[in-house]
C-alpha cells in the first residue's frame, strides 16, 4: 500500500523522544549492558529506517523479525549488528553471511536440514533461542542446547549469544516469570561454554525486573514511549510517547434530527447536529470497532458516529469548524490527550497492536 501524502492524515514521529526513552532506560540498567533496539514491524509502526538512523549512536545493535526487515536496514546504510529474532528459511543463510546478520537458532531440526543440504555455515553468527515457557520457538532441553552448540561450532559457526523471552513480565504476578527465569538459568548453568551475550530482557523485563538483566537488553515497546503492560502496571519512570496520529476536517455539515450516518445506518441524530468527515478508516488501521470512541477537535472530545468506513469516519462536533481544522486521534490537543493505550483499551487489545496496525497509507513525518 502506497502512502497518501495528499490528504491530511499523518503520523508524526518524535525521534528525539525515542532517543530520550533509550537514554532513560539506559540510566536504569547495569552499566555496560548492551542495548539492542527492536525495530521489527516497521519499528512498531514508527518507520524502521528513520528510527534506526536516528538512534544508531545510542544503541549497540538492532533486532528485527525476519531477514527482509534486516536487508532493508543494511540497504539503508545501517552497519551495526542486526539480530533476526524469528526462524529464518534455510536459503537465508547465504544472505545472512553476505549482509553480516545474526540468525536465531531454535531447534536441532533446522541445523540438521542445513547439514543435509550441505550449506556452508563457515562464518555464520547465531544466537540460540531457549523456550523457557513462551511456547513459540526455542530449545526446551539442556541436552539439545549442548548438541546444537557442538554441531554449529564444528561447522564453523560463531555461537555469539543465547536468549529467551518472558511471557508475563508485564503482569502483576511474578510466579510464571520466576519459573521461566529459573528454567533459563538451569540451561545456562548446564552449558560447558557460555556464549558471550546472554539476554532475556524485553521492554517489560527491563522496566520491572531490572535485577534479572544479564548483559544485554532488547528495547521494544518502551523505546517508543509505550507502557508494555497497558494500564496494568505503572511505569517506574517517565517515558515519552513518540507517535501522534492526526488528520483534519474535510467536510462539515449540519443535519436534521433523524438523519443517519454510515453503513447500516447505525447512528441516527436525535436532534439537529453538526457532523464532520475525517479521512481515515480501517484501511489505515483505524479499525471498525472504534465506533463511538472520541477524537479531539479544538481540545474537545468528539465522538465517532456511525460505522468506521474503509477511508473515512464521521464525528459529531459541538459547533461548526472550518475545513482543515486539526483532528487528533492519538496525542495531545488543547489540554486533552488520547494515548495509544486508551485506544487499545477501547478495542480490548494492546497498544503494540494499535501502532503496528497503522498502515503504510499514512505518511510518517519526522521531527
Curated annotation (Swiss-Prot):
Record field: catalytic activity: L-alanine = D-alanine
GO annotation, cellular component aspect: cytosol
Record-linked SMART domains: Ala_racemase_C
Isomerase keyword on record: yes
GO MF term list: alanine racemase activity; pyridoxal phosphate binding
Its EC number(s): 5.1.1.1
Catalytic residues, chain numbering: 40 (proton acceptor), 263 (proton acceptor)
Binding positions for substrate per the UniProt entry: 136, 310
BP GO terms, sorted: D-alanine biosynthetic process; peptidoglycan biosynthetic process
Domain of life the protein comes from: Bacteria
Cofactor: pyridoxal 5'-phosphate
Function: Catalyzes the interconversion of L-alanine and D-alanine. May also act on other amino acids.
Protein name: Alanine racemase
Amino acid at each position: 500500500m502506497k502512502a497518501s501524502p495528499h490528504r491530511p492524515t499523518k503520523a508524526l514521529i518524535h525521534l528525539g523522544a525515542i532517543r530520550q526513552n533509550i537514554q532513560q532506560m539506559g540510566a536504569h540498567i547495569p552499566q555496560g549492558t548492551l542495548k539492542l533496539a527492536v525495530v521489527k514491524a516497521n519499528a512498531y509502526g514508527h518507520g524502521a529506517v528513520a528510527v534506526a538512523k536516528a538512534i544508531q549512536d545510542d544503541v549497540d545493535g538492532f533486532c528485527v523479525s525476519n531477514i527482509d526487515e534486516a536487508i532493508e536496514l543494511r540497504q539503508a546504510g545501517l552497519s551495526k549488528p542486526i539480530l533476526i529474532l524469528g526462524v529464518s528459511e534455510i536459503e537465508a543463510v547465504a544472505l545472512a553471511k553476505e549482509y553480516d546478520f545474526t540468525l536465531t537458532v531454535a531447534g536441532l531440526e533446522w541445523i540438521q536440514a542445513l547439514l543435509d543440504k550441505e550449506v556452508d555455515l563457515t562464518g555464520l553468527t547465531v544466537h540460540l533461542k531457549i523456550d523457557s515457557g513462551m511456547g513459540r520457538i526455542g530449545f526446551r532441553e539442556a541436552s539439545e542446547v549442548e548438541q546444537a552448540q557442538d554441531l554449529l561450532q564444528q561447522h564453523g559457526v560463531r555461537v555469539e549469544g543465547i536468549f529467551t523471552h518472558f511471557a508475563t513480565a508485564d503482569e502483576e504476578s511474578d510466579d510464571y516469570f520466576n519459573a521461566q527465569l529459573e528454567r533459563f538459568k538451569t540451561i545456562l548453568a548446564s552449558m560447558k561454554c557460555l556464549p558471550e551475550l546472554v539476554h532475556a530482557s524485553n521492554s517489560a523485563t527491563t522496566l520491572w525486573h531490572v535485577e534479572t538483566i544479564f548483559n544485554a537488553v532488547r528495547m521494544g515497546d518502551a523505546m517508543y514511549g509505550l507502557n508494555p503492560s497497558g494500564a496494568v502496571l505503572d511505569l517506574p519512570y517517565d517515558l515519552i510517547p513518540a507517535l501522534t496520529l492526526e488528520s483534519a476536517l474535510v467536510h462539515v455539515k449540519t443535519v436534521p434530527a433523524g438523519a443517519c450516518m454510515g453503513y447500516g445506518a447505525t447512528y441516527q441524530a436525535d436532534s439537529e447536529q453538526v457532523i464532520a468527515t475525517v479521512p481515515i478508516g480501517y484501511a489505515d488501521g483505524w479499525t471498525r470497532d472504534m465506533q463511538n470512541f472520541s477524537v479531539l477537535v479544538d481540545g474537545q472530545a468528539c465522538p465517532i458516529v456511525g460505522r468506521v468506513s474503509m477511508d473515512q469516519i464521521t464525528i459529531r462536533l459541538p459547533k461548526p469548524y472550518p475545513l482543515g481544522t486539526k483532528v487528533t486521534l492519538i496525542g495531545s490537543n488543547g489540554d486533552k490527550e488520547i494515548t495509544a493505550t486508551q485506544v487499545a483499551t477501547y478495542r480490548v487489545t494492546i497498544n503494540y497492536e494499535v501502532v503496528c496496525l497503522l498502515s503504510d497509507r499514512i505518511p510518517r513525518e519526522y521531527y
